[in-house]
Amino acid sequence: MLWTQAAAARETLSYLDRKGIDAEPALLGAGLSRSQLSQDDIGVSVASQYRFLELAAAEADDSLLGLHVAAEMDLRAIGILFYLGETSPTVSEALDNLARYSKTANEALVVAILRHKDEATMTIRRVQEPDEPPRQFFELLALWFVRTLHLQTNRHFNPLRITFSHARNSDLREVHRFLRCPVDFAQAVDSWVLPQRVMDLPIVSEDSRLLRILTAHADDLLERHPVVCQITSGKAQPQLLEDFAEGRALFRQVSGE
């Protein structure tokens, strides 16, 4: 069984609750419980998360649920991957860290960065194909990625294009409105293509000392057996990130930022 920290499922459950939509049928259908998703130290199977998002979209009668969740979610919910990016010096190095440490959040995905003269492409491939296309998950992930880059660079720019491996025949105009770039469906791979100039942008909150601490923790997570990682990483990670946030706030207060 492949494991995920289930940030997408937790954020989707929170979204349904805020909108007054009954999440229990989707939870039951995915083999999940509210108590599981209320605890950050419990991971779930990747297949269960995919299934929950698809069932939640059906319950909400919202074919764009993943995008709607991503538009409102706390970007930090993804955990250590967000903070690895936030403390990196440039977008290029932030994406390298995302690719290197992606399995700390989701064992089912392989992330790669391909660099060309005028553009760079981040691709995501699945270790194994799910029973049904995880459309909501990957659309949520796409908007999370774009919003995170905007926040961490304090710049608003559009990807050159985004591709999804799943098909979509409806609400295409709305998808483009959210992602603000050409989007192609039913492609060989899920990918985000950025101009090379974006790769060179600085991360406004770059912090080399904190990055070293975070990468050491992430390296430790990668070295653990998946079962151990599932049980323990969630317990250590929230405290580390809480300490990180408090330390950064104190630093800004003292330095007058």
Model regions and ranges:
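DNA-contacting interfaces and partner/effector-binding or oligomerization modules
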Residues: 110, 114-201, 205
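Short polybasic/polar patches that bind polyanions
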Residues: 17, 28, 58, 151-153, ...
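Surface-exposed, interaction-prone regions with an acidic/low-complexity signature
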Residues: 1-8, 14, 127-128, 134, ...
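N-terminal low-complexity or simple alpha-helical regulatory segments
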Residues: 1-122
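Short, well-ordered alpha-helical segments
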Residues: 10, 92, 135-143, 208, ...
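Extended mid-to-C-terminal alpha-helical interaction segments
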Residues: 177-257
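Short hinge/gating elements
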Residues: 79-85, 127-131, 199-200, 219
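Hydrophobic alpha-helical core bundles mediating ligand binding, dimerization, or RNAP-core interactions
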Residues: 53, 142-145, 218
